[in-house]
């Protein structure tokens, strides 16, 4: 993969596989649409459930609204309405009610990036799907969010801020494989096949509410070698308490978000962004049961989420 093409939103074009010598089909077979989520099964879920020790549940989502910083031009707006109640007209004889109208992008705030999010410069997506064929203005015909099964797995919080002895890393600051391995040793944990790995940098805990403009203008992030390492470990998803996972500004100005391509396009690994990791870090939680069931919007590329970590 030469460069990463960062695509946002749905793609405009009219499900086929690409006959491309440079493209390797997934280990899960031609036509697979869920990537490393195939690693989750009844046995792995039962094993992960044994991590519950205290029963404390942590919300990994954050509150979002029309002022939430987002990757341009993403935004959202919400209107609360009273259908049929115009001009003082009674809605029902026995009740009144509110409805809400959401207008916005699913790739805002705490989100999962699906396997249809990132392609290479030739629009080759995960498992050799041709982006020019699967990407319609009305939604993806392959690799849509609705294909993702329940993600119930062993979760790991890797505390990069702690190993660097800071409250938070700075925008544009990378953490490399050496940093990750130092944190794993310090926490006495190891990455295993089927895990959901989430990095704590302190960025959201210390910047999201107090300085949202700074929070959204850049972010600390992983180096490509970290993404490759986690792909070799066969994880299901990789997340962080940043809006990008990759470092912003990027290491190479003309090659943004390299980790996205390595994880999603090349290996079928999901990305979790803007994870609320502060409370887990404060409680020194390293392992937990991770639970996520994304909304099944047919053809969606990304989805706003609120995963749960149970200690």
Put a short name on every predicted segment.
Residues 4-13:
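Sec-dependent N-terminal signal peptides
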């Amino acid at each position: 993969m030469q460069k990463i093409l960062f695509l946002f939103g749905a793609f405009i074009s009219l499900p086929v596989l690409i006959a491309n010598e440079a493209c390797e089909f997934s280990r899960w077979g031609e036509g697979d649409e869920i990537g490393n989520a195939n690693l989750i099964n009844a046995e792995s879920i039962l094993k992960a459930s044994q991590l519950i020790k205290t029963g404390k549940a942590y919300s990994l989502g954050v509150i979002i609204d029309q002022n939430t910083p987002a990757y341009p031009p993403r935004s959202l707006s919400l209107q609360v309405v009273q259908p049929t109640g115009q001009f003082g007209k009674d809605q029902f004889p026995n009740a009144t009610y509110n409805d809400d109208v959401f207008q916005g992008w699913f790739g805002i705030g705490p989100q999962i990036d699906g396997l249809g999010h990132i392609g290479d410069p030739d629009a080759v997506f995960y498992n050799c799907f041709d982006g020019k064929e699967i990407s319609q203005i009305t939604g993806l015909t392959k690799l849509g969010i609705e294909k993702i099964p329940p993600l119930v797995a062993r979760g790991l919080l890797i505390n990069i801020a702690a190993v660097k002895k800071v409250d938070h890393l700075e925008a544009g600051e990378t953490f490399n494989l050496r940093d990750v391995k130092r944190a794993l040793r310090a926490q006495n944990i190891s990455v295993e096949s089927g895990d959901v790995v989430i990095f704590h940098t302190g960025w959201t805990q210390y910047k999201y509410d107090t300085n949202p403009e700074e929070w959204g203008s850049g972010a600390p992030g992983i180096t490509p070698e970290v993404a490759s390492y986690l792909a070799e470990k066969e994880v299901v998803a990789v997340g962080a308490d940043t809006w990008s996972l990759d470092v912003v500004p990027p290491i190479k100005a003309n090659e943004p978000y390299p980790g996205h391509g390595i994880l999603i396009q090349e290996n079928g690994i999901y990305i979790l962004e803007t994870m609320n990791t502060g409370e887990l870090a404060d409680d020194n939680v390293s392992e937990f049961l991770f639970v996520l069931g994304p909304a099944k919007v047919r053809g969606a590329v990304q989805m706003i989420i609120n995963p749960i970590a149970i200690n």
